[in-house]
From Swiss-Prot:
Protein name, as recorded: Uncharacterized protein C83.12
Superkingdom field: Eukaryota
Annotated Gene Ontology cellular component terms: cytosol; nucleus
Amino acid sequence: MKRVNFTISGHGYILIKPNYPDHFNYRLPADMKFYKCVLTINYISVSSMSGPFTGPYEKYSSGYFSEFGPQHLFSINRYHGLRFSRQSSQEYDSVGHILYSPITYYVSGAEHVTMDSIDQRREFQDSIYTHDSSDSENIMSDSSQSECDYADLMINLDKLI
């Protein structure tokens, strides 16, 4: 399993979107919003984020993010930057439509990892969407430069605020 180095710094915006199984073909609805958070992930890459998730996005400030508590899973997604996810029961809007199940976050402006070959890209995609959250590890012992696996990891947001 290949590894990626990254650093944690500064402020950023996160996008809350439904966690549909087909992330690669999903297109953002017009009313999708960004929520401010005290987290930006910068990790080694040779190209910028591209695809249907690129801007321009209107940014909104909200305390919504902090209500989820200090512990969240995240993974590096080659196509969409950094992904946060919180396992939760389904949430509904006022007319009963499912909003998020589970909730997933995408960090705006994140650069994605570039693999050297199509086989590595496939391995990378498979590792993201077939991960076992029980294999998560805490990487906050050194926030200046940490190594992470392609599988989801655990991060304590309290240490960043």
